[in-house]
């Protein structure tokens, strides 16, 4: 149920505009993923890069910022996502920010239908081995501690009604189990046929306004509640969660509008054997 709710969220027209806010949190990790991938130091030419499940294009933005003009003058950058609204958003971003030799297109991350042995670097997870060139690099990131979930759990538990809410581990397991720890991530990549696997846990200290944090959490609520609440609980209590979130943040942080958070992700890079 949670996976279907997540898919419905990705496909909704409102998702792209709301998801842009998430770059406040995902942006620093996108740059770290690019740094860890080694793409800047790569001697492979031309670079043929896939930003798979690209969202609003935050990884592609980091790539464009990190690589020099000569490299980008000959590269090929494909931004793929299953959401038509996000593809439209990224195509507009490509024009607005002047990304050379870049395009956005509809791509199902789990069945890309893209050509085999084509890309030098892929940023994402599914089906990467087939479409990578021999010697190509995959770089992925997955949440280990999405701190917004901890905040939402505390706020919901303060509401009347003894309402259930998942732990971080329970929620992540309901989506893709095993990608939130270093060793299982390493094992999964090696089992897929990759070598030179490197895995690290990284965190970023951020400060977000209360209202921004509430707006970041709201779009994810249907994904959580669709898995862990009954229809009756949702009908009665879901509409009260934003108010509960604001109340929790006001109680915890007082007059200060800044909320310190330190989300944590697993970053992994691996190579397709030559």
Swiss-Prot record:
Which InterPro entries does this entry report, sorted A to Z?
Methyltransf_25, SAM-dependent_MTases_sf
Q: Which GO terms describe its biological process?
A: methylation
The knockout note for this entry states: Diminishes greatly the production of the two bis-thiomethylated analogs of acetylaranotin, bisdethiobis(methylthio)-acetylaranotin and bisdethiobis(methylthio)-acetylapoaranotin.
- Protein induction: Expression is co-regulated with the acetylaranotin gene cluster.
Q: What is its EC number?
A: 2.1.1.-
Question: Annotated pathway, please?
Answer: Mycotoxin biosynthesis
At the top of the EC hierarchy, this enzyme's class is transferase
User: What GO molecular function annotations does the UniProt record carry, in alphabetical order?
Assistant: methyltransferase activity
Pfam families given in the database record: Methyltransf_25
Query: What are the UniProt keywords, alphabetically?
Result: Methyltransferase, S-adenosyl-L-methionine, Transferase
User: SUPFAM superfamilies of this UniProt entry?
Assistant: S-adenosyl-L-methionine-dependent methyltransferases
In the record, the note on similarity to other proteins reads: Belongs to the class I-like SAM-binding methyltransferase superfamily.
Q: What else is known?
A: AtaS is located outside of the acetylaranotin gene cluster.
Q: What is known about what this protein does?
A: Acetylaranotin bis-thiomethyltransferase involved in the biosynthesis of acetylaranotin derivatives, members of the epipolythiodioxopiperazine (ETP) class of toxins characterized by a disulfide-bridged cyclic dipeptide. The first step of acetylaranotin biosynthesis is performed by the NRPS ataP which produces diketopiperazine cyclo-L-Phe-L-Phe via the condensation of 2 phenylalanines (L-Phe). The ataC domain of ataTC then catalyzes the formation of bishydroxylation of cyclo-L-Phe-L-Phe.
Q: What is this protein called?
A: Acetylaranotin bis-thiomethyltransferase
The organism named in the record is Aspergillus terreus (strain NIH 2624 / FGSC A1156)
State the organism's lineage: Eukaryota, Fungi, Dikarya, Ascomycota, Pezizomycotina
Query: Its encoding gene is what?
Result: ataS
């Amino acid at each position: 149920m949670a996976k279907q709710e997540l898919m419905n969220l990705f496909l909704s027209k409102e998702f792209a505009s709301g998801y842009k806010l998430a770059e406040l949190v995902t942006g620093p990790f996108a740059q770290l993923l690019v740094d860890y991938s080694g793409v800047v130091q790569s001697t492979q030419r031309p670079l043929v890069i896939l930003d798979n499940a690209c969202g609003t294009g935050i990884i592609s933005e980091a790539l464009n910022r990190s690589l020099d003009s000569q490299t980008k003058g000959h590269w090929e950058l494909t931004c793929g996502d299953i959401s038509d609204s996000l593809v439209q958003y990224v195509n507009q971003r490509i024009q607005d920010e002047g990304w050379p030799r870049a395009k956005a297109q509809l791509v199902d991350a789990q069945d890309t239908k893209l050509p085999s042995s084509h890309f030098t670097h892929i940023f994402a997870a599914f089906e990467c081995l087939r479409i990578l060139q021999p010697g190509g690099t995959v770089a992925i990131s997955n949440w280990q501690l999405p701190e917004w979930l901890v905040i939402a759990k505390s706020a919901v538990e303060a509401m009347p009604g003894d309402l259930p809410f998942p732990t971080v581990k329970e929620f992540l397991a309901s989506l893709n189990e095993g990608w939130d720890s270093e060793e299982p991530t390493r094992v999964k990549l090696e089992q897929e046929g990759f070598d030179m696997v490197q895995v690290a846990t990284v965190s970023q200290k951020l400060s977000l306004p209360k209202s921004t944090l509430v707006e970041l959490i709201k779009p994810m609520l249907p994904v959580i509640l669709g898995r862990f609440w009954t229809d009756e609980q949702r009908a009665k209590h879901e509409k009260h969660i934003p108010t509960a979130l604001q109340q929790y943040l006001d109680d915890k942080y007082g007059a200060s509008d800044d909320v310190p958070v330190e989300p944590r992700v697993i970053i992994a890079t691996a190579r397709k054997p030559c």
